[in-house]
Protein backbone atom coordinates (compact mmCIF):
# COMPACT_ATOMS: atom_id res chain seq x y z
CA UNK A 1 0.00 0.00 0.00
CA UNK A 2 1.34 3.42 -0.94
CA UNK A 3 1.59 6.19 1.64
CA UNK A 4 -1.87 7.66 2.14
CA UNK A 5 -1.09 10.46 4.58
CA UNK A 6 1.87 12.58 3.59
CA UNK A 7 3.55 14.87 6.13
CA UNK A 8 2.59 18.53 5.90
CA UNK A 9 5.83 20.47 5.58
CA UNK A 10 4.20 23.79 4.74
CA UNK A 11 5.09 26.85 6.82
CA UNK A 12 4.50 30.58 6.88
CA UNK A 13 7.41 32.93 6.24
CA UNK A 14 7.91 36.69 6.44
CA UNK A 15 10.52 39.24 5.42
CA UNK A 16 12.25 41.25 8.14
CA UNK A 17 9.79 44.05 7.31
CA UNK A 18 6.80 41.79 7.95
CA UNK A 19 5.81 41.10 4.35
CA UNK A 20 4.25 37.62 3.94
CA UNK A 21 6.23 35.22 1.76
CA UNK A 22 4.18 32.06 2.25
CA UNK A 23 4.21 31.21 -1.46
CA UNK A 24 6.44 31.78 -4.49
CA UNK A 25 5.50 33.66 -7.65
CA UNK A 26 4.64 30.32 -9.25
CA UNK A 27 2.12 29.61 -6.47
CA UNK A 28 4.18 26.89 -4.80
CA UNK A 29 4.75 27.02 -1.02
CA UNK A 30 7.95 28.65 0.18
CA UNK A 31 10.38 25.95 1.25
CA UNK A 32 12.94 25.97 4.03
CA UNK A 33 15.64 26.25 1.36
CA UNK A 34 13.93 29.31 -0.14
CA UNK A 35 13.65 30.89 3.30
CA UNK A 36 17.33 30.35 4.06
CA UNK A 37 18.41 31.87 0.75
CA UNK A 38 16.21 34.95 1.23
CA UNK A 39 16.72 35.32 4.98
CA UNK A 40 13.03 34.96 5.78
CA UNK A 41 11.60 34.71 9.28
CA UNK A 42 9.39 31.75 10.28
CA UNK A 43 5.99 32.45 11.79
CA UNK A 44 5.32 31.78 15.46
CA UNK A 45 2.86 29.02 14.61
CA UNK A 46 5.36 27.37 12.26
CA UNK A 47 7.90 27.28 15.08
CA UNK A 48 5.35 25.87 17.52
CA UNK A 49 4.36 23.18 15.01
CA UNK A 50 7.72 21.56 15.77
CA UNK A 51 6.44 20.86 19.28
CA UNK A 52 4.48 17.64 19.76
CA UNK A 53 0.77 18.26 20.39
CA UNK A 54 -0.71 15.05 21.87
CA UNK A 55 -4.25 16.45 22.00
CA UNK A 56 -4.16 17.44 18.33
CA UNK A 57 -2.70 14.11 17.26
CA UNK A 58 -5.39 12.25 19.23
CA UNK A 59 -8.05 14.38 17.55
CA UNK A 60 -6.67 13.57 14.09
CA UNK A 61 -6.67 9.84 14.88
CA UNK A 62 -10.25 10.16 16.12
CA UNK A 63 -11.29 11.83 12.85
CA UNK A 64 -9.72 8.98 10.89
CA UNK A 65 -11.57 6.37 12.94
CA UNK A 66 -14.88 8.22 12.57
CA UNK A 67 -14.38 8.49 8.81
CA UNK A 68 -13.65 4.76 8.53
CA UNK A 69 -16.76 3.90 10.55
CA UNK A 70 -19.06 6.28 8.67
CA UNK A 71 -18.15 5.13 5.15
CA UNK A 72 -19.29 1.91 3.50
CA UNK A 73 -16.84 0.00 1.41
CA UNK A 74 -18.05 -0.22 -2.18
CA UNK A 75 -18.50 -3.57 -3.87
CA UNK A 76 -15.25 -4.77 -5.45
CA UNK A 77 -13.43 -1.75 -3.99
CA UNK A 78 -9.81 -2.46 -3.15
CA UNK A 79 -8.39 -1.89 0.31
CA UNK A 80 -6.20 0.87 -1.13
CA UNK A 81 -9.18 2.53 -2.77
CA UNK A 82 -11.29 2.42 0.37
CA UNK A 83 -8.41 3.66 2.50
CA UNK A 84 -7.91 6.61 0.17
CA UNK A 85 -11.58 7.54 0.46
CA UNK A 86 -11.31 7.37 4.24
CA UNK A 87 -8.31 9.71 4.21
CA UNK A 88 -10.06 12.13 1.83
CA UNK A 89 -13.14 12.16 4.05
CA UNK A 90 -11.01 12.66 7.14
CA UNK A 91 -9.28 15.66 5.57
CA UNK A 92 -12.65 17.14 4.58
CA UNK A 93 -13.95 16.78 8.13
CA UNK A 94 -10.75 18.17 9.64
CA UNK A 95 -10.73 21.22 7.35
CA UNK A 96 -14.18 22.30 8.56
CA UNK A 97 -12.79 23.47 11.92
CA UNK A 98 -10.08 25.85 10.61
CA UNK A 99 -12.46 27.17 7.93
CA UNK A 100 -14.96 28.08 10.63
CA UNK A 101 -12.22 29.70 12.69
CA UNK A 102 -11.10 31.80 9.72
CA UNK A 103 -14.64 33.10 9.17
CA UNK A 104 -15.04 33.96 12.85
CA UNK A 105 -11.70 35.78 12.86
CA UNK A 106 -12.79 37.85 9.86
CA UNK A 107 -16.02 38.92 11.57
CA UNK A 108 -14.17 39.89 14.75
CA UNK A 109 -11.52 41.77 12.77
CA UNK A 110 -14.19 43.90 11.08
CA UNK A 111 -15.69 44.82 14.43
CA UNK A 112 -12.31 45.55 16.00
CA UNK A 113 -11.33 47.89 13.17
CA UNK A 114 -14.58 49.64 12.30
CA UNK A 115 -17.34 48.39 14.63
CA UNK A 116 -18.92 46.64 11.62
CA UNK A 117 -21.46 43.99 12.62
CA UNK A 118 -22.69 40.97 10.65
CA UNK A 119 -26.38 40.67 9.83
CA UNK A 120 -28.47 39.07 12.56
CA UNK A 121 -29.40 36.24 10.20
CA UNK A 122 -25.71 35.48 9.59
CA UNK A 123 -24.87 32.03 10.97
CA UNK A 124 -21.93 33.54 12.86
CA UNK A 125 -24.01 36.20 14.60
CA UNK A 126 -24.50 34.15 17.77
CA UNK A 127 -20.75 33.89 18.29
CA UNK A 128 -20.24 37.54 17.34
CA UNK A 129 -22.89 38.73 19.81
CA UNK A 130 -21.02 37.10 22.71
CA UNK A 131 -17.75 38.66 21.56
CA UNK A 132 -19.32 42.10 21.13
CA UNK A 133 -20.63 42.00 24.70
CA UNK A 134 -17.15 41.15 26.01
CA UNK A 135 -15.41 43.70 23.77
CA UNK A 136 -17.73 46.59 24.68
CA UNK A 137 -17.34 45.84 28.38
CA UNK A 138 -13.56 45.41 28.45
CA UNK A 139 -11.76 47.01 25.47
CA UNK A 140 -11.18 50.76 25.53
CA UNK A 141 -8.75 51.23 22.64
CA UNK A 142 -7.55 49.13 19.69
CA UNK A 143 -3.93 49.49 18.55
CA UNK A 144 -3.59 46.62 16.07
CA UNK A 145 -5.94 44.04 14.56
CA UNK A 146 -4.82 41.18 12.29
CA UNK A 147 -1.41 42.83 11.98
CA UNK A 148 1.98 41.24 11.33
CA UNK A 149 4.39 41.63 14.24
CA UNK A 150 8.14 41.11 13.78
CA UNK A 151 10.89 40.30 16.25
CA UNK A 152 14.14 41.14 14.48
CA UNK A 153 16.23 40.27 17.53
CA UNK A 154 15.18 36.63 17.53
CA UNK A 155 14.15 36.32 13.87
CA UNK A 156 10.46 35.45 13.82
CA UNK A 157 7.14 37.04 12.91
CA UNK A 158 3.42 36.35 12.98
CA UNK A 159 -0.04 37.81 12.62
CA UNK A 160 -1.60 38.94 15.89
CA UNK A 161 -5.38 39.05 16.28
CA UNK A 162 -5.57 42.09 18.52
CA UNK A 163 -3.44 44.51 20.53
CA UNK A 164 -5.70 46.66 22.69
CA UNK A 165 -6.23 48.38 26.02
CA UNK A 166 -8.16 46.24 28.53
CA UNK A 167 -10.00 47.98 31.37
CA UNK A 168 -8.33 45.76 33.97
CA UNK A 169 -5.04 44.62 32.45
CA UNK A 170 -4.02 47.62 30.37
CA UNK A 171 -2.38 47.13 26.99
CA UNK A 172 -2.68 43.46 26.01
CA UNK A 173 -1.84 41.07 23.21
CA UNK A 174 -4.97 39.01 22.47
CA UNK A 175 -5.41 35.89 20.34
CA UNK A 176 -8.77 34.35 19.46
CA UNK A 177 -9.37 30.59 19.42
CA UNK A 178 -12.42 28.64 18.29
CA UNK A 179 -13.20 25.08 19.32
CA UNK A 180 -16.05 22.64 19.75
CA UNK A 181 -16.78 23.08 23.46
CA UNK A 182 -18.47 20.21 25.26
CA UNK A 183 -18.46 20.41 29.05
CA UNK A 184 -15.76 23.04 29.27
CA UNK A 185 -13.24 24.83 27.08
CA UNK A 186 -9.77 23.36 26.59
CA UNK A 187 -6.54 25.33 26.88
CA UNK A 188 -3.07 24.38 25.62
CA UNK A 189 0.48 25.35 26.52
CA UNK A 190 1.23 26.38 22.93
CA UNK A 191 -1.43 29.10 23.17
CA UNK A 192 0.48 30.70 26.04
CA UNK A 193 3.75 30.31 24.15
CA UNK A 194 2.22 31.96 21.08
CA UNK A 195 1.03 34.95 23.12
CA UNK A 196 4.43 35.26 24.82
CA UNK A 197 6.15 35.34 21.43
CA UNK A 198 3.82 38.08 20.17
CA UNK A 199 4.28 39.99 23.42
CA UNK A 200 8.02 40.24 22.72
CA UNK A 201 7.23 41.95 19.41
CA UNK A 202 5.31 44.82 21.01
CA UNK A 203 6.96 47.75 22.76
CA UNK A 204 6.07 48.53 26.34
CA UNK A 205 5.86 44.97 27.70
CA UNK A 206 2.07 44.53 27.29
CA UNK A 207 0.05 41.86 29.05
CA UNK A 208 -1.33 38.84 27.25
Task: Please report, for each region that a protein language model flagged, where it lies by residue.
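Metal-dependent nuclease catalytic cores that hydrolyze phosphodiester bonds in DNA/RNA
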Residues: 1-157
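Mg2+/Mn2+-dependent nuclease catalytic core
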Residues: 146-208
